[in-house]
Amino acid sequence: MSASPKGFRFATVSAGFRKEARPDLALIVSDTPATAAGVFTTNRFQAAPVVVARENLSARPVARAVVINSGQANACTGDEGMTNCRTTLDLVGKACGIPAAEVLPASTGVIGAQLHMDKWREAAPRLAAALGQNTHHDFARAIMTTDAFPKVAERELAIAGTTVRLVGMAKGAGMICPNMATMLSVVLCDAAVTPEAWQRLFLDAVDRTFNRVTVDGDTSTNDTVFGLANGASGVTVEGEDLAKLGEALTDVLARLAYMLVQDGEGATKVMRVKVSGAVDDAEAEAVARTVGHSQLVKTAMYGRDANWGRIVAAVGRSGASFKAEDVVVTLCGVELFRNGQPTDLDFDTLLREPLKGRDVTVDIELGAGTGHYELLASDLTHDYVNCNADYRS
Amino acid sequence: MSASPKGFRFATVSAGFRKEARPDLALIVSDTPATAAGVFTTNRFQAAPVVVARENLSARPVARAVVINSGQANACTGDEGMTNCRTTLDLVGKACGIPAAEVLPASTGVIGAQLHMDKWREAAPRLAAALGQNTHHDFARAIMTTDAFPKVAERELAIAGTTVRLVGMAKGAGMICPNMATMLSVVLCDAAVTPEAWQRLFLDAVDRTFNRVTVDGDTSTNDTVFGLANGASGVTVEGEDLAKLGEALTDVLARLAYMLVQDGEGATKVMRVKVSGAVDDAEAEAVARTVGHSQLVKTAMYGRDANWGRIVAAVGRSGASFKAEDVVVTLCGVELFRNGQPTDLDFDTLLREPLKGRDVTVDIELGAGTGHYELLASDLTHDYVNCNADYRS
């Protein structure tokens, strides 16, 4: 296990937001102000912590701390929810000696209920006192909801002869039964980067990774990704080295994104949908999303069924432009469809073993241009329905 | 049971396209040339019968016959599939003494395999000989695939003191395991209507009905709706009476569309998503489709779960314009969400009984304009996954 980036301390405590007794409040503090960036849900209903974090970052792209609670989403909670969110930042900031405006909040859990402020008041001093006693692995564990495993990715790179470290923690595309998916992630880096450069690298990395995974297409009111770079390694990254840092950042987020799909509710497969030859990237994305969201394709993958017809039908209704006879569909390296017809390969036999694995690749070549896109998607399983159809009758 | 429209005869035979011995080839013949219209799948991969039927109708909007086979879709079959389709029309036309150009084909079943032409040659004379020995109920039964029940809707109306009859037959949004959904429908009318007027009434009725139902969002290579009006009642419908006929036609198709959702694979619910107050109808449609396609909403309905959060989240990611605090969500008449927050009603108790029923209404008021849209959607159930995840390993 590689070390965590320098200059960040972690704390987790059980505040009692959840029914079971387990850490449900997690804090990261940077010893010095860190360059900070955030990407948030595009849902029109935005949770209070999303609104507050966005405000803090747009006022000044600098942060000293990130505080995340699980168990309560503080979404659809009106003005009281906004006030409560700001109060939690005051409580945590005061306990740690940090301005509230430099604390970034995120929440995940049941929506529509107000935060238990008494529990926050009780927990904040304990949280501050615990700083340095926990690791980023503890942090990843404390933000879990229905996740089957904590999600951590680490990376080191050498810049100007010195080691720069990155670590990312995430919680899952596994939904919060009985509410909705919330994806939260924090990535930390001990390089010094200008706010403009960090923002650019961060948005680009998120776009190439988290924005290209799907479990069920539902996005939550709380989805949040934060990136903090505090300079504690003593290395300033600029000029040509920025590309190296961007590559490492993308790698960390890509590994977390893969884990999100792997741990999607009830998922048994990680389907990699690779579309090429589209008129442009946007049409390639439309094809990838139509295939990756198709209930029929997702159940076929669960059923280990080399069902080219469902893939072809999804491609055909995606709205993308192409000639039917130019499309080639390949599943796990076996060509299923070409010249408007299934190939004459015995693909049921050829694919029996490959489709038993966790990773399934669907290559779709449209023959209409150079646009391409890649999406990771989960399958649709009995356990997905079990988890989400919680009979109350 | 009301009578069938005058001047149409029906025949069904077992041609052997399916594994089990049952009628799988069905024919309608009109005694006189009928004004004909068709609506077809928008999927870019179009089955041979879709291409041929479209050609026949665009050459001349008149038909004497409709022939439908189940068991083989004749989709993704290349040039040979096109030739075979035209040959089937020759065979049926010759057997019935009708020009092949006035026979409209549709097919449903396994895709990617060529039609069994020997079976068509053997069956065509038997089919012609059986004309008049079967009813429209037999027709509806012969075109079934995985449908749980045949789908028929009838309607009479008086125009100028004379009875005009309509009958519609459909097969289902239940998928053809292990391939894809195919929806086929034929509506017959014994009024005389000009091609222009019939086309307009028919497209409008399809748009208000079949285009507003969804089981899983997947559309097939073969989806087809035909409408034939043969004038055998002796009544010519024109002028103000056209609105009456249009209303009756829409009613017939609406009842069939409801049955398609009711019989969606594994479905236990028919969810009526009614969106109002959108900026325009297109945004209302986007909201209705996002909610109706949401796996989380669909599993919640299956689970009889008054889960306002999932509905709100789907509304929020639909892309429609509105203020979060203006949205009102009502489930089976019980207001769940208003002013950006859940209402304080005890909706779990209030909705326990209503959510046990088959029909569930979701009203979504956006408060942003006058746009509205209504969509019928099925739920997502264990049986859906059972039916579509056919383990081959």
Swiss-Prot record, chains A, B:
Annotated catalysed reactions: N(2)-acetyl-L-ornithine + L-glutamate = N-acetyl-L-glutamate + L-ornithine; L-glutamate + acetyl-CoA = N-acetyl-L-glutamate + CoA + H(+)
Description of how the protein assembles with itself and partners: Heterotetramer of two alpha and two beta chains.
Keyword flag Amino-acid biosynthesis: yes
Pathway: Amino-acid biosynthesis; L-arginine biosynthesis; L-ornithine and N-acetyl-L-glutamate from L-glutamate and N(2)-acetyl-L-ornithine (cyclic): step 1/1; Amino-acid biosynthesis; L-arginine biosynthesis; N(2)-acetyl-L-ornithine from L-glutamate: step 1/4
Documented EC number(s): 2.3.1.35, 2.3.1.1
Positions contributing to substrate binding: 145, 171, 182, 265, 388, 393
A Gene Ontology molecular function term of the record: L-glutamate N-acetyltransferase activity
Active-site residues, record numbering mapped to chain: 182 (nucleophile)
Biological role stated in the UniProt entry: Catalyzes two activities which are involved in the cyclic version of arginine biosynthesis: the synthesis of N-acetylglutamate from glutamate and acetyl-CoA as the acetyl donor, and of ornithine by transacetylation between N(2)-acetylornithine and glutamate.
Name the record gives this protein: Arginine biosynthesis bifunctional protein ArgJ
Cellular localisation: Cytoplasm
Residues at the site labelled Involved in the stabilization of negative charge on the oxyanion by the formation of the oxyanion hole: 108-109
CDD domains: OAT
Gene Ontology terms: cellular component: cytoplasm
One biological process term in Gene Ontology: L-arginine biosynthetic process
Keyword vocabulary terms for this entry: Acyltransferase, Amino-acid biosynthesis, Arginine biosynthesis, Autocatalytic cleavage, Cytoplasm, Multifunctional enzyme, Transferase
Pfam families associated with the record: ArgJ
UniProt site (Cleavage): 181-182
Similarity-based family: Belongs to the ArgJ family.
Family matches, as PANTHER family: ARGININE BIOSYNTHESIS BIFUNCTIONAL PROTEIN ARGJ, ARGININE BIOSYNTHESIS BIFUNCTIONAL PROTEIN ARGJ, MITOCHONDRIAL
Principal subcellular localisation of the protein: cytoplasm
